[in-house]
Regions:
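Short, solvent-exposed loop/turn segments at secondary-structure junctions
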Residues: 50-52, 125-130, 145, 170-172, ...
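Catalytic core of non-heme Fe(II) oxygenases with the double-stranded beta-helix
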Residues: 131-205, 244-248
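Non-heme Fe(II)/2-oxoglutarate
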Residues: 2-25, 211, 218-278
Length: 278
């Protein structure tokens, strides 16, 4: 995997010791050409982000969480919706997930695309199940549905990078992910709420441990999970001045990040939404 370095200076000279930091050096886990492709297409495939023991640790942690939250899981399955079971606040629930806070293969790309001042919007999972009598796929959707029409002169376009990390192979049994390249730049229309194919869509099948990084407003959908359970993580980044994801309600009062923040450094605090504003 090709890498290159970026250096940023945050123009905050009146407060050089403030919560933004002033000088940042980022070793980006991607080539400039790959970043340009990401800019234009709205998605970037990263093969083999996790392999061997690292992949198994994530699978085991998610399986443990699925069993602990079995009531929510069973309700999601009974609801017969194609979204499956979506546990939230994963970094508060297992050290294995908290270890992803500074995962450079994705974090460095987020900083290359959005600047050094980024935070975690959240870490969630989505588990879909085969079976009769329910929907097995998701409709077309976007994750940052806040664009108004017409666009105001000083409208702040929302940017978000969602890293879809697949813990199982994507194939015809588990369901591939479909995307529409370039649709993240379509500010004049929203994604349709249908399951059917649309013009220009691309189907992506990757091996377990791989990731598909998408702009939060890229049109995408999950194809049917027909014969085997599909597990995925959703690791999301935004600029520090965007709030964290509202989905999933309040974080657990006994969550792991509370104690972690007591001794966290500037970067860790920023990633968890404390600091990075001025």
């Amino acid at each position: 995997m090709e890498r290159h370095k970026l250096q940023y200076e945050v123009l905050n000279h009146h407060n050089p010791n403030g919560e933004t930091g002033q000088h940042w050096e980022v070793e980006v886990h991607a080539s400039p050409e790959e970043l340009q492709t990401f800019t234009e297409m709205g998605y970037l495939v990263r093969e083999g982000l996790f392999q061997g023991e690292a992949l198994q640790k994530l699978r085991d942690a998610l399986d443990r969480l699925e069993e602990r939250e079995w009531e929510k899981r069973d309700n999601a399955i009974a609801g017969k919706k194609g979204w499956g079971f979506i546990p939230r606040h994963l970094m508060d629930k297992d050290e294995v997930f908290l270890d992803l806070l500074k995962f450079q293969p994705t974090l460095s790309i987020a900083r290359a695309m959005m600047g050094p001042l980024v935070r975690l919007r959240g870490l969630s999972a989505r588990i879909t199940y085969p079976g009769d009598g329910r929907e097995h796929q998701t409709p077309w959707h976007q994750h940052m549905r806040v664009i108004s029409n017409p666009i105001p002169p000083w409208f702040s376009r929302p940017h978000c990078i969602d890293c879809l990390i697949y813990l199982d192979d994507l194939n015809e049994d588990t369901g591939a992910v479909a995307v529409v390249p370039g649709s993240h730049d379509w500010l004049d229309k929203a994604s349709p709420t249908i399951h059917e194919p649309v013009e220009g869509e691309v189907h992506l099948q990757v091996k377990a441990g791989s990731g598909v990084l998408i702009h939060g407003n890229l049109w995408h959908r999950g194809l049917p999970t027909l014969n085997a359970k599909r597990r995925m993580l959703i690791l999301s980044y935004t600029p520090t001045w965007l709030r964290k994801s509202p989905h999933g309600g309040a974080q657990p009062k006994d969550g792991l990040t509370h104690a972690f923040l007591e001794d966290a450094d500037l970067e860790e605090r920023m990633l968890l939404g404390v600091g990075g504003y001025s």
